[in-house]
Amino acid sequence: MENLTLSIVTPYGSIYNGEVKYVVIPGSEGEFGVFPGHCNLLSLLKVGVIEFENLEGNKGLVAINWGHAQISDTDVNIIADGAVAIAGNTESEIVAAISDAKTLLKEASDDSALFGMVVSRVESDYKNFIK
């Protein structure tokens, strides 16, 4: 099976660059999934969480405030204004990343329902990221 190359960058640098099995992206018209072989697409991105699975089967989450995605059959390139990877080697590092993500998301959206939904999703999955 072919894989995707996922690149997530901000004006401050690279957040993630690697091979993945799939990506779920918060598009401006709703979330959508990308698998290898996807058609070419450009999409605006809204406040939300990018979810992906790397080749080892580990799930990754990256909170973004807004941006855009360029998708081809083998690549997903995301440029976000702001992004926080929910990752770390210890629970305290992950809790700090979640706190940073909450701050980013809160500043990006006045929609309290959307904010609550995204934060709830991040918090419910955080234990999956402790290595």
UniProtKB/Swiss-Prot annotation:
Q: Which UniProt keywords apply?
A: ATP synthesis, Cell inner membrane, Cell membrane, CF(1), Hydrogen ion transport, Ion transport, Membrane, Transport
Among CDD domains, the record links this protein to: F1-ATPase_delta
Transmembrane region(s) = none
Report a single Gene Ontology molecular function: proton-transporting ATP synthase activity, rotational mechanism
Q: Which GO terms describe its cellular component?
A: plasma membrane; proton-transporting ATP synthase complex
Fetch the Gene3D superfamilies from UniProt: F0F1 ATP synthase delta/epsilon subunit, N-terminal
Membrane topology per the entry is: Peripheral membrane protein
| Keyword Cytoplasm part of the UniProt annotation | no
Q: Where in the cell is it found?
A: Cell inner membrane
Please, which domain of life does this record's source organism belong to?
Bacteria
Pfam families xref list: ATP-synt_DE_N (PF02823)
Instruction: Kindly state the subunit structure of this protein.
Output: F-type ATPases have 2 components, CF(1) - the catalytic core - and CF(0) - the membrane proton channel. CF(1) has five subunits: alpha(3), beta(3), gamma(1), delta(1), epsilon(1). CF(0) has three main subunits: a, b and c.
Stored PANTHER family: ATP SYNTHASE DELTA/EPSILON CHAIN (PTHR13822), ATP SYNTHASE EPSILON CHAIN, CHLOROPLASTIC (PTHR13822:SF10)
Similarity remark: Belongs to the ATPase epsilon chain family.
Q: What does this protein do?
A: Produces ATP from ADP in the presence of a proton gradient across the membrane.
Q: What is this protein called?
A: ATP synthase epsilon chain
Species annotation: Helicobacter hepaticus (strain ATCC 51449 / 3B1)
Gene encoding this chain?
atpC
